[in-house]
Each structure stands twice: as structure tokens, then as C-alpha cells.
Amino acid sequence: MANDKLSEQSMDFAVQIINLVKQLKEQRESIISNQIGISGTSIGANIREAKYAHGTADFISKMQIALKEANETGYWLELLYKTNYIGKEQYNLLESKCKSMRAMLVSSINTAKNNSK
């Protein structure tokens, strides 16, 4: 059930990231927009892959990749904010959602590790 909520949140986040990429491309910013587009949409893709993992180790691996992508996305968001491509309100909204997913991913990974002992 928690993974369904995480899947839903990651899909909503990916949609917001794609909209951000469109906004950045209108501002003629392409390097960071490509990076955040990849990392921000990869979170949900890896969570979706984890749903059909070949066992606990594979599940944990996919969720750890999603966590790494979420951390990378947080970096790009901060960089966009600090270089004035996005405002404080947009940064706070997206970073809050990204942080929430990171917390859920850490929890899912820890639960899977504890259940595999």
C-alpha cells in the first residue's frame, strides 16, 4: 500500500518535472533542464520497476536507484533556485515533494532490509 502511494507521488512529481523542463526550455536553458528531466522522471520509473522485482535484493536495488535519482533531482532543483531559473515558491514546492519521496524511499528500503533478515 505504501508503495502505491509512492508510485502515485512519483508520477505526479514526474509530471511537475516535465512541466518545469518545458518552462526552462522556454527560458532557453537546456543543460540543467535535460539533467533534471532525466533524474526527476527516473525516480518513478525505478519505483515502477521495483514493483516487479526478482526478489528482495532486486527490489532494494531498484529503490536505492530511485533514492539516488531523488537526491540528484534535489541537487538540480537547488541549483536552478540559486541561479534564479526558478523562484523560491516553486523551489520550496518541488523540493518538499522530492524530500517526501526520499523519506518514503528510505523507509521502504529499511523495511525491505529488515524483512529479509
Tell me the role of every PLM-derived stretch.
Residues M1-K117:
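Short, C-terminally biased terminal segments at protein or domain edges
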